[in-house]
């Protein structure tokens, strides 16, 4: 049983959709119909007006950094493509970017910024701490910096931390309303409410809470972010959102047919269930996972109140790889270890998407109890 925090188990209706006749996305009009339906469904999950999903260059939606439209796009590539594409589309030499971080992916934004010639200011806390909001205020108030873009992560998957991005967005807007905001919501979107209407580029991916296979990076993009992209020379062809804003004359490259069909089907299941019901299911699964973990003497990496409804990271100092291997070999349950410096000390349970069910969590924790 696959219980990692992405990729997740893919439900049978999605697998069935993937097995149907393969169509050519470059010449078959049916593909455009599927892609349009996919972006409409994505818009519903993002919480923006489907009429503004941008497939023909349209705009509209519930308000951009509170008042602009949001267009929704889906690029062919894993979720990291979205992070790099956001930077590649907005950053050029000299662009000042504030990277707010308390984990691996927050720091990764700074690496992307520097690789495209931007000036990254990393405002960071330790991976088991909240976002450093006081340090954010200090950075925003510093006279020597005039930030163009700010980046942050909603759910730091390696530590299972759900960040208070609302407070960070408030402080950025109060300090300088012109700063464009980029948020990695890859492991929260679909399982946790995300304030997309306050974010200029909100990033998602197919293999997390949507429970489709890896292969698509999604984004909801504001009008002012599009304007910033159009005002600069492109520094990349593939990692570039702009060609996807208007696909009325075709896609910039051959799209990933099977992945588009799969995500469309997965989003259909999610919306049929209802966003509120899906989020309640994630909360219930997370609560059961932590309750069962506490019974086994396991502690979460962040404080429980900062743990994400989509993933639980348990402390397992020096034992994570051993426990992971025994679970796989003895019980056919697959969990993830930590990443980076925490790789050997953290064991992660992904209760997101199709896996956000109490019965699946109970089966997982029963297996974990047997090997501890």
Feature-to-residue mapping (PLM):
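Conserved active-site segment immediately N-terminal to the catalytic lysine
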Residues: 196-207
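Conserved beta-loop-alpha segment that forms the PLP phosphate-binding cup at the N-terminus of a helix
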Residues: 39-40, 69-99, 105-110
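A glycine-/small-polar-enriched, mobile loop at the entrance of the PLP active site in fold-type I
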Residues: 1-54, 58, 63-73
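PLP-dependent aminotransferase-like
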Residues: 89-146
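Conserved PLP-binding catalytic core of the aspartate aminotransferase-like
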Residues: 299-330
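Active-site C-terminal subdomain of aminotransferase-like
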Residues: 10, 207-291
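Active-site phosphate-binding strand-loop segment of PLP-dependent enzymes
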Residues: 131-186
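PLP-dependent enzyme catalytic core of the Aspartate aminotransferase-like
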Residues: 347-372
């Amino acid at each position: 049983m696959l219980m990692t925090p992405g990729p997740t188990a893919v439900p049978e209706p999605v697998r069935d959709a993937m097995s149907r006749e393969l169509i050519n996305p470059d010449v078959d009009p049916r593909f455009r119909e599927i892609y349009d339906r996919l972006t409409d469904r994505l818009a519903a999950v993002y919480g923006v007006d489907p009429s503004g999903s941008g497939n023909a260059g349209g705009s509209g939606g519930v308000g951009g950094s509170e008042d602009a439209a949001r267009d929704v796009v889906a690029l062919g590539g894993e979720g990291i493509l979205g992070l790099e594409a956001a930077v590649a589309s907005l950053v050029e030499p000299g662009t000042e970017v504030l990277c707010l971080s308390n984990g691996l992916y927050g720091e990764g934004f700074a690496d992307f910024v520097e690789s495209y010639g931007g000036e990254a200011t990393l405002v960071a806390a330790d991976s088991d701490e909240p976002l450093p909001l006081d340090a954010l205020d200090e950075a925003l108030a510093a006279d020597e910096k005039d930030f163009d873009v700010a980046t942050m992560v909603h759910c730091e998957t390696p530590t299972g931390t759900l960040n208070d991005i609302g407070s960070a967005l408030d402080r950025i807007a109060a300090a300088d309303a012109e700063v464009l905001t980029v948020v990695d919501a890859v492991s929260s979107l679909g399982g946790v409410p995300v304030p997309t209407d306050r974010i200029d580029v909100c990033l998602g991916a197919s293999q997390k809470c949507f429970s489709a296979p890896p292969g698509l990076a999604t984004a909801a993009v504001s009008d002012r972010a599009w304007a910033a992209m159009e005002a600069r020379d492109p520094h990349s062809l593939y990692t570039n959102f702009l060609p996807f804003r208007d696909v009325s004359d075709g896609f910039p490259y051959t799209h990933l047919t099977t992945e588009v069909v799969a995500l469309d089907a997965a989003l259909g299941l999610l919306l049929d269930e209802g966003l509120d019901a899906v989020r309640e299911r994630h909360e219930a699964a997370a609560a059961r996972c932590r309750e069962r973990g506490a019974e086994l003497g396991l502690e979460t990496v962040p404080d429980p109140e900062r743990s994400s409804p989509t993933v639980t990271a348990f402390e397992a100092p020096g034992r994570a790889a051993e426990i992971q291997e025994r679970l796989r070999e003895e019980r056919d349950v697959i969990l993830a270890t930590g990443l980076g410096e925490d790789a050997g000390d953290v064991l992660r349970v992904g209760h997101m998407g199709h896996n956000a069910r109490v019965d699946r969590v109970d089966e997982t924790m029963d297996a974990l109890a047997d090997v501890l």
